[in-house]
Amino acid sequence: MATELQHGAAIEIDQLYKQFGKKNVLQGIDATIHGGEFVAVVGKSGCGKSTLLRHVAGLETATSGEVRQNGERIDGINQQACLMFQDSRLLPWQNVLTNVGVGLRLEGEWQRQAAALLKDVGLDGRGNDWPAVLSGGQKQRVALARALASGPKLLLLDEPLGALDALTRMEMQQLVERLWLIHRFTALLVTHDVSEAVMLADRIIVIEEGRIVMTKDVSLPRPRVPTAPGFADIQETILNELLGIQAEKPLLQQTN
């Protein structure tokens, strides 16, 4: 592997409030994420999940409360975290190798390291290509390699697979999981996709209107498939919460 990442960062979120104007976006969020854990945050659009991620990244200032990493308050940009977005945000005027090298600050033997990272994400030999010739999934592979380049202890994923087709999305889920299992960074994923959350996460946090309304452990063996025993039950539990359906009645019966 290109880089040896240390064990992931532990995150504590303590009574986090965020207000934009008169709108309360986060309302007393309390959560603990253990080092090396993979946690997914799910919720409807506008529930506050991406705002929460930005606070962990140090890109927002809380109205009150705080986020701590390994016991220290995060003030300013979190230097031990890297973000992946739905848009790969590659530099169109630089080739693929240099885009990955940005994560290495283009120092030392960055070209060798960047090439090794591209191999890790399944793009061996594509370093001289321009971003314009890559598919959406390939661009996200480059973005993942760039995110891993600095050896982050925390990988923040803001719906990075949301714009991909179903097959490419599955391939990327498998890649993210494989690299997480190897490097054991802490991963925090924001997604609308409940199936994706069950596929990847050790634990799922459900947010509604800026509050945590459910936390669900996912103890299924890895690698996971949607047809595995227990997968559909966990998915249905989360969907029932999001849709406001009483848990004692199966979702399919509720919708008939």
Curated annotation (Swiss-Prot):
InterPro entries, from UniProt? AAA+_ATPase, ABC_transporter-like_ATP-bd, ABC_transporter-like_CS, ABC_transporter_ATP-bind, P-loop_NTPase
| Residues that coordinate or bind ATP | G43, K44, S45, G46, C47, G48, K49, S50
User: Which EC numbers characterise this protein's activity in its record?
Assistant: 7.6.2.14
- Tell me the membrane topology, using the record's own terms: Peripheral membrane protein
* Cellular localisation: Cell membrane
- Domain named ABC transporter is located at 11-234
Name the catalysed reactions. Answer: ATP + H2O + aliphatic sulfonate-[sulfonate-binding protein]Side 1 = ADP + phosphate + aliphatic sulfonateSide 2 + [sulfonate-binding protein]Side 1
Q: Which domain of life is it from?
A: Bacteria
Pfam families found in the cross-reference section: ABC_tran
Drop me one GO molecular function for this one. Answer: ATP hydrolysis activity
In the record, which residues are listed under signal peptide?
none
Read off the Gene3D superfamilies from this record: P-loop containing nucleotide triphosphate hydrolases
Outline what the protein does. Answer: Part of the ABC transporter complex SsuABC involved in aliphatic sulfonates import. Responsible for energy coupling to the transport system.
* Family indicated by similarity: Belongs to the ABC transporter superfamily. Aliphatic sulfonates importer (TC 3.A.1.17.2) family.
Quote the protein name from its UniProt record. Aliphatic sulfonates import ATP-binding protein SsuB 2
Q: Organism source for this protein?
A: Shouchella clausii (strain KSM-K16)
* Gene this chain is encoded by: ssuB2
